[in-house]
């Protein structure tokens, strides 16, 4: 069994990597991937904590997080596809400019 601290440190590293990608990247597809990494890091923390205290609650929360991530990914990719068809780019700086 992995010690609690090692699992939580790994989850924190993954979360920080996802947050860094979310803040630095200007491409919406990479931002969506970074958000998925952050969701998986939080789910990993739930599983590690549940395993440490020998409770199945962490695994239940993991299933909920994966369901949330799947719904977020499907809606996000559908929106990205429509935006790319209209603007021919996924750069957030060009998409956020106002027309008028």
UniProtKB/Swiss-Prot annotation:
Subunit architecture: NDH-1 is composed of 13 different subunits. Subunits NuoA, H, J, K, L, M, N constitute the membrane sector of the complex.
Subcellular location: Cell inner membrane
One of the protein's GO biological processes: ATP synthesis coupled electron transport
Superkingdom to which the source organism belongs: Bacteria
Major localisation: membrane
One term of GO molecular function: quinone binding
Membrane topology: Multi-pass membrane protein
Record protein name field: NADH-quinone oxidoreductase subunit K
Species of provenance: Pectobacterium atrosepticum (strain SCRI 1043 / ATCC BAA-672)
């Amino acid at each position: 069994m992995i010690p609690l601290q090692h699992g939580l440190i790994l989850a924190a590293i993954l979360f920080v990597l996802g947050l860094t990608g979310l803040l630095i990247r200007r491409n919406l597809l990479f931002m969506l991937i970074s958000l998925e990494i952050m969701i998986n890091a939080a789910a990993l923390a739930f599983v590690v904590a549940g395993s440490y205290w020998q409770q199945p609650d962490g695994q239940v929360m993991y299933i909920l997080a994966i369901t949330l991530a799947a719904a977020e990914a499907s809606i996000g990719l559908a929106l990205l596809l429509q935006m790319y068809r209209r603007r021919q780019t996924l750069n957030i700086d060009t998409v956020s400019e106002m027309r008028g």
